[in-house]
């Protein structure tokens, strides 16, 4: 049987009149569709022939195409209402002298990784393809242009989205076997001459990459700290050196990009059998504290949350709280500065002012949770399959109204608006709420993409349990499940099928909306021009009045969750 030819070049198209997004303030027009090329397998990889869908052998972890965006000299303004309300917390590890970074000889010069990735002899990196005139393109481009970093299969691409030839990557890294599953850019250290990128792989290794100099360093090499795939990775807010990675074995690890690795041994002060057993039952096991004086090597801190995959996490705008999503359908919120835990919900994104958490997951629902009130205020029904990403649009938010979007395996992009006034408690219906069944969009061949992998861990909402008051237990507060009839239902203001493959990522920029999909399509919609609909605020307020019948309720439709004090 002939091996199919795999296209190795990206393709840029400009669909005419295709897939407009119509909302109150105007129409978002699809500007372009950048289709990333899927690289062929490395010659050393054994081809998978006729895989058995019923096989119990674990498949290699994948994540679809994720995109990290950066503008080294931002032209965009930060929405004013955000800066008014956010009070930043002290730096992570503040007070531990062992974490004070060593002084730099040239204070204006950023430290770079030591190894040249183009000339690398490492078996981890297969090869690097750079654009023949990359230096010229970098020197001639505007510093206000947008860079994008994207993963697809075993490739990692650096793209200039402000270029007319945006389909031609400035650099493409091909790894031998590992797939990059997640990546992030340091907003503190970025400049026209320096960009710090960290990326986590399916092998557990982490790459610190500086694309302008094409230097790199390998962290957690061969899983010396944690030998489990990296599921999500983010720079710690405000830090030049520290970043956090979640692993598929339920561990959260804080690394320093400039420290060497060492074989990790848990630092448990009381090694008695009773103490170890008691520690294993805690919702957050601190295997190494950020306050440890042993900070010569990685990890800086290591926490065990569960014996299952951590899917995602997000830092709150006040830089104190961390929302962590687990594969069993729960979300835990912790004060990561104090290494303390509380929480229990579904899937994660913070509002720009830190007042709300929006969640989405395997029950096909999006949920709005009030963080100050510790309760659910609305459920958002509109997806037909698992919700893969949620994000707020800060340019459409103000002190009272909020805009966010969600994407999922049903190939849909949904936009939602809600205001404080519309989130009131509805009347309790006499009839019991029927438990909703998740449906897969028949038009998508990918609807069951994740279900075979984690069907045993999938947790359904128990919508017929009655609401009770909080009850304390071992310094925790347990939130019983509330009937769905008591919870507000919020409809989307826009729902659109985008393409034919699952959508993996969603991002908002000042001038556009962007998505990426499983097969490598990066789509960009231009925002409506100013003045198209000056009456949008009036219309949205009337919409809020009509939608307010949905109301709100306390935590509902969720598995029993646990909350402790900060």
Swiss-Prot record:
A Pfam family annotated for this UniProt entry: WD40
Subunit structure: Interacts with creB.
Gene: creC
Keywords, alphabetical: Repeat, Transcription, Transcription regulation, Ubl conjugation pathway, WD repeat
The WD repeat ranges on this chain: 225-265, 305-340, 341-379, 382-426, 498-535
InterPro entries documented for this protein: WD40/YVTN_repeat-like_dom_sf, WD40_repeat_dom_sf, WD40_rpt, WD_repeat_creC_regulators
Annotated family: Belongs to the WD repeat creC family.
Residue ranges with Low complexity bias: 540-566
Role of this protein: Component of the regulatory network controlling carbon source utilization through ubiquitination and deubiquitination involving creA, creB, creC, creD and acrB. Required to prevent the proteolysis of the CreB deubiquitinating enzyme in the absence of carbon catabolite repression. CreB deubiquitinating enzyme stabilized in a complex with the CreC leads to the expression of genes such as those in the proline and quinate pathways.
A GO biological process held by the record: carbon catabolite repression of transcription
Composition skew (Polar residues), residue ranges: 433-447
Gene Ontology CC annotation, any one: cell tip
Keyword check for Repeat: yes
Protein name per its UniProtKB record: Probable catabolite repression protein creC
Region of interest (Disordered), ranges: 433-470, 533-566
